[in-house]
Amino acid sequence: MIKYNKVVLAYSGGLDTSIIIPWLKENYGCEVIAVCGNVGQKDELDGLEEKAIKTGASKLYIEDLTQEFVDDYIFPTIQAGAIYEGKYLLGTSFARPIIGKRLVEIAKAEGADAICHGCTGKGNDQVRFEMAVKAFAPEMPIIAPWRIWDIKSREDEIDYAEAKNVPLKINRETNYSKDKNIWHLSHEGLDLEFPENEPQYDKILELCKTLEAAPNEATYITLSFENGIAIALNGKKMNSVELLDELNKIGGENAIGITDMVENRLVGMKSRGVYETPGGTILYKAHKDLEELCLDKETAHYKEQIALKFADLVYNGQWFTPLREALTEFVNKTQETVTGEIKLKLYKGNIVNAGMTSPYSLYSEEYATFGEDGVYDQKDSAGFINLYGLPTVVKAKMQEKIKKEEM
């Protein structure tokens, strides 16, 4: 096995990365520098430094990336309208590139020989982390223990942790695999691995109330957007992190953003997860509805195609690629007129548009009215339909001619 003097580890304090510290020291005899990217996981950071040092790390960096994460990764993805397979709001996907980028920066500053992550060889995150590392340090060796060690399951991990006296907050019965940041909380594993099982929402959910426990009265909110970015809630301007935090509270209280889905992983298999994305779900709905008011037909329809590709790029770990950057430039152009206010009604998991306005609205009451109007001459429709239907008419006549010749 190759020897390294100093390894930088992507560290969360969870089961995987907690046991990797003693494993690295045992197998490589190296110094381990743990790096935790704070992307809004909040209480999960409590006691993290003490745990990392106690487990064998020489130091722990806790890098506050939350503001950059929201401004440079989350909001551009909302503007793009990117949703993976129609359901997944990419909560884990776009958190990995920013953490990977910071890992490289610290590894270079520390003079590290390698970067290590705790991603399973069956998952998407191994690709996302390593794509980020390759984008900024293509020569940097990457250690992925799940691809080389003898540990084969989470039960094996717990056994190893107990043998190495690694403190754990989980037990064998409640060992859901989770990922949390300011955008979402995901749950995988245990009973969720069987699609026939209904999720035990009353036991799983942490950010959101269940539908049954949500208030029996609707909650109304108003969001203000400027160039496709939410800038105010109920008339109060906020920075992006404050706004998302507040929407998470409001959305969670109303059971907004609970998704149970089976998705197609990049590595080829299907997996099932339950996602809580309360604030994000509200933002996507508000932004999409405002675009309906502000974008012309051709731009809106073409942008839907861009959204699909953008989602694939983010999901597949291709954030730092020329194509993703080019698509973002296109999206930015489309957002120049996505400015206005939208009122939303939140009720037991539902989000209903309760009215919106924009100085760039392309909706004209004069043209759209079903009543009497003086701006639209309905007689013009006849000529339009004749030209629009010309290919259909020509084809029909051709088919009629062939039938006659065959008789």
Swiss-Prot record:
Binding residues annotated for L-citrulline, in chain numbering: Y88, S93, N124, R128, S177, S186, E263, Y275
Residue runs in coiled coils: none
Localization (cell): Cytoplasm
UniProt-annotated binding residues for ATP: A10, Y11, S12, G13, G14, L15, D16, T17, S18, G118
Pathway recorded for this protein: Amino-acid biosynthesis; L-arginine biosynthesis; L-arginine from L-ornithine and carbamoyl phosphate: step 2/3
UniProt keywords, alphabetically: Amino-acid biosynthesis, Arginine biosynthesis, ATP-binding, Cytoplasm, Ligase, Nucleotide-binding
EC number: 6.3.4.5
Entry annotated with the keyword Amino-acid biosynthesis: yes
Binding site for L-aspartate: T120, N124, D125
Catalytic activity: L-citrulline + L-aspartate + ATP = 2-(N(omega)-L-arginino)succinate + AMP + diphosphate + H(+)
Stretches that traverse the bilayer: none
Biological processes per GO annotation: argininosuccinate metabolic process; L-arginine biosynthetic process; urea cycle
A molecular function (GO) term: ATP binding
Main location as per UniProt: cytoplasm
GO cellular component, one term: cytoplasm
Alphabetical list of HAMAP family matching this protein: Arg_succ_synth_type1
Quaternary structure annotation from Swiss-Prot or TrEMBL: Homotetramer.
Listed PANTHER family: ARGININOSUCCINATE SYNTHASE
Family assignment from sequence similarity: Belongs to the argininosuccinate synthase family. Type 1 subfamily.
The protein, known as: Argininosuccinate synthase
Native source organism of the sequence: Clostridium beijerinckii (strain ATCC 51743 / NCIMB 8052)
Gene symbol of the encoding locus: argG
